[in-house]
């Protein structure tokens, strides 16, 4: 497969940017799915802990990007379970 891509790139050099962008997009999508699978509190890999989101405090940031919220200064407004 890689040999075909290199062969096509040698024959048609205008395809090189296309291969670069497709490879970058596939790598980014894979890394994003890996991030969601490992760090998202909605995903549960441990059957002994069926509700992992209860361990998160109000100052834990699990969003991908937050604009103006400083999570370290938030007060705790919910009870412990």
Curated annotation (Swiss-Prot):
UniProtKB keywords: Acetylation, Electron transport, Leigh syndrome, Membrane, Mitochondrion, Mitochondrion inner membrane, Phosphoprotein, Primary mitochondrial disease, Respiratory chain, Transmembrane, Transmembrane helix, Transport
Topology within the bilayer: Single-pass membrane protein
GO cellular component, one term: mitochondrial inner membrane
Transmembrane feature ranges: 15-37
Chief subcellular location: mitochondrion
Modified positions (N6-acetyllysine) in chain numbering: 10
Intervals, Mitochondrial matrix compartment: 1-14
Domain of life, per lineage: Eukaryota
One Pfam family recorded for the sequence: B12D
Phosphoserine, modified sites: 66
Ranges facing Mitochondrial intermembrane side: 38-81
Signal peptide: none
Listed GO biological process terms: cellular respiration; mitochondrial electron transport, cytochrome c to oxygen; mitochondrial electron transport, NADH to ubiquinone
UniProt-recorded Gene Ontology molecular function terms: NADH dehydrogenase (ubiquinone) activity; protein-containing complex binding
InterPro entries named among the record's database cross-references: B12D (IPR010530)
Location of this chain's protein in the cell: Mitochondrion inner membrane
Other facts noted in the record for this chain: During complex IV purifications dissociates from complex IV upon treatment with standard detergent DDM (decyl beta-D-maltoside) in high concentrations.
Family: Belongs to the complex IV NDUFA4 subunit family.
Disease listed for this protein: Mitochondrial complex IV deficiency, nuclear type 21: An autosomal recessive mitochondrial disorder with onset in infancy. MC4DN21 is characterized by congenital lactic acidosis, encephalopathy, global developmental delay, delayed speech, motor dysfunction, dystonia, and spasticity. Ataxia, peripheral neuropathy, and seizures may also occur. Patient tissues show variably decreased levels and activity of mitochondrial respiratory complex IV.
Self-association state and partner proteins as the record states: Component of the cytochrome c oxidase (complex IV, CIV), a multisubunit enzyme composed of 14 subunits. The complex is composed of a catalytic core of 3 subunits MT-CO1, MT-CO2 and MT-CO3, encoded in the mitochondrial DNA, and 11 supernumerary subunits COX4I1 (or COX4I2), COX5A, COX5B, COX6A1 (or COX6A2), COX6B1 (or COX6B2), COX6C, COX7A2 (or COX7A1), COX7B, COX7C, COX8A and NDUFA4, which are encoded in the nuclear genome.
Function: Component of the cytochrome c oxidase, the last enzyme in the mitochondrial electron transport chain which drives oxidative phosphorylation. The respiratory chain contains 3 multisubunit complexes succinate dehydrogenase (complex II, CII), ubiquinol-cytochrome c oxidoreductase (cytochrome b-c1 complex, complex III, CIII) and cytochrome c oxidase (complex IV, CIV), that cooperate to transfer electrons derived from NADH and succinate to molecular oxygen, creating an electrochemical gradient over the inner membrane that drives transmembrane transport and the ATP synthase.
Descriptive protein name: Cytochrome c oxidase subunit NDUFA4
Species for this entry: Homo sapiens
